[in-house]
Regions:
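N-terminal secretory signal peptides that target proteins for export/translocation
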Residues: 1-9
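N-terminal periplasmic/intermembrane-space "pro-region" immediately following the signal or transit peptide
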Residues: 2-3, 23-63, 69-71
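Bacterial N-terminal signal peptides
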Residues: 14-24
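Outer-membrane beta-barrel pore domains
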Residues: 30-32, 69, 81-82, 238-248, ...
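Outer membrane beta-barrel
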Residues: 45-68, 76, 80-211, 216-224, ...
Length: 444
């Protein structure tokens, strides 16, 4: 290699590193937002023009956890191994590449996004999509590929920005992986002087199985839509935002047997079967409705934020699970009957900065009731066909976050998990499944 080539290579690497690190303070807060670092003033861009449309970002979350018992079931990064109640793990390690084309007026014209997650559990694709923008009035866009479903606030809040280590139980069961394959159309004015620049409307069609399946196992698509009121300043001290969400979908019955809530001759709550031959191949309803609100108060003793989100709807499943499947549920290759349940759940956050933004207190409460038609000792009662899939869980999360800087933070978080006391073996009383998490996060 000649001396000139060596010098050019060193300049290239040095310039790339400078651009790479200079954007460290900027990050996407929501899963489908455009990275704000694309619109930095020309203080860094002139360093190397060839990277002016490219943005590389990422974050890493190593953590240590302790559970109350060996083999504890957990929605805080997965169940513990049978004979273990403590573990080190790399919860997430993301690398993301965004390529943005802009118009002469510096409005977005096209965006390509690719993101992977590489941990000790393997490497998976988290995002792969393209977004095309209408450039006449800069109000509309179309997104196609594998990307976040436009439903709910917590689902769409990025894991590097979320204060609690994990999303709630309901989100993980009903929206596993958060992403899905589909197409989405959006109204979101890019011009900040536009009258409606504080609102956003997303609507799209999706396969429905999300990341849990490699292809759509039936022809039924989910329609998902969300209307968002972006944080709006009422006065100098109060900000308010919110949204409403809708999902209308379903998945194909693999048999003619469809079970719904009812009562037996003794008046006990059970699942009643409909065995009409017309049920086979039909779509069982998967309908979700959601609403959320965020209120932030700015004061001299620290920023305070309240968040509330509520979901309810209808969820098809099996006798033992309410999770969305990647394929038609089977046992030994034989399709399982469909069980239709009515659910509800909610999340509540209280966030308090202590004097400054370095210290933050986190309090979270959430619940998931997979079958609101039954409760407590009705579950597992002799003569009924109710299972552990009906049990209501609620979780209280207590945490403290220390922000070393805009890129690095340390979280101490304790989850107090409670389940209904039922007549089912293993759930006669509250199980010991509380989890403590200590997490370090670095993002760039």
């Amino acid at each position: 290699m000649t001396l000139v080539k060596q010098i050019n290579r060193k300049r290239f690497l040095a310039s790339f590193l400078f651009v790479f690190l200079s954007f460290g303070g900027y990050c996407q807060r929501y899963l489908t937002d455009i990275d704000s670092s694309f619109f930095i003033k020309d203080t860094v861009r002139p360093v190397l023009k060839r990277f002016e449309n490219l943005r590389i970002s990422g974050y890493m979350q190593p953590q240590f956890q302790v559970a109350a018992t060996d083999g504890a079931p957990s929605f805080e990064g997965g169940n513990f191994a049978q004979f273990s109640k403590s573990r080190f793990m790399l919860r997430r390690a993301r690398l993301k590449i965004d390529y943005l084309l802009t118009s002469k007026e510096k409005f977005p014209k096209a965006l390509f996004t690719f993101q992977i997650d590489a941990t000790e559990r393997g490497v998976i694709v988290r995002d792969m999509f393209i977004r095309l923008f209408e450039t006449k009035k800069n109000n509309l866009s179309m997104t196609a590929g594998f990307f976040a479903r436009p439903f709910g606030f917590e689902v769409n809040l990025g894991s590097s920005s979320r204060e609690s280590p994990e999303r709630g139980r309901m989100s993980q069961i009903l929206m596993p992986g958060e992403r899905d394959l589909g197409v989405m159309f959006s109204f979101e004015p890019q011009n900040k002087t536009q009258k409606l620049n504080h609102v956003k409307l997303d609507a799209g069609f999706f396969n429905g199985q999300g990341a849990s399946g490699t292809t759509d196992f039936d022809s039924h698509k989910d329609f998902i839509s969300r209307f968002i009121l972006k944080p709006y300043t009422i006065n100098k001290k109060i900000e308010i935002g919110g949204g409403i969400s809708l999902l209308l979908g379903g998945w194909k019955n693999g048999t003619k047997y469809v079970y719904e809530s009812g009562k037996n001759a003794s008046g006990d709550k059970i699942f009643v079967v409909d065995s009409s031959v017309h049920n086979f191949g039909r779509s069982s309803p998967r309908h979700y409705y959601g609403a959320d609100m965020q209120v932030k108060l700015h004061s001299g003793w620290g920023e305070t934020e309240w968040r509330a989100e509520y979901w309810f709807g209808t969820q098809p499943g099996t006798a033992t699970s309410t999770a969305n499947p990647g394929t038609i549920p089977t046992a030994n290759g034989i399709p399982l009957p469909t069980y239709v349940r009515h659910y509800n759940g909610a999340y509540f956050y209280f966030l308090q900065n202590i004097v400054d933004t370095k210290h933050q207190l986190i309090i979270k409460y959430d619940w998931y009731d997979p079958n609101e038609k039954v409760k407590k000792k009705e579950i597992g009662k002799a003569g009924t066909n109710l299972t552990a899939a009906e049990i209501k869980f609620y979780t209280i999360g207590l945490g403290y976050m220390y922000n070393f800087n805009t890129q690095t933070k340390l979280i101490f978080y304790y989850d107090i998990v409670k389940n209904e006391s039922t007549n089912l073996a293993g759930f006669l009383d509250d199980n010991k499944d509380n989890i403590f998490t200590c997490r370090l996060q670095f993002r760039f």
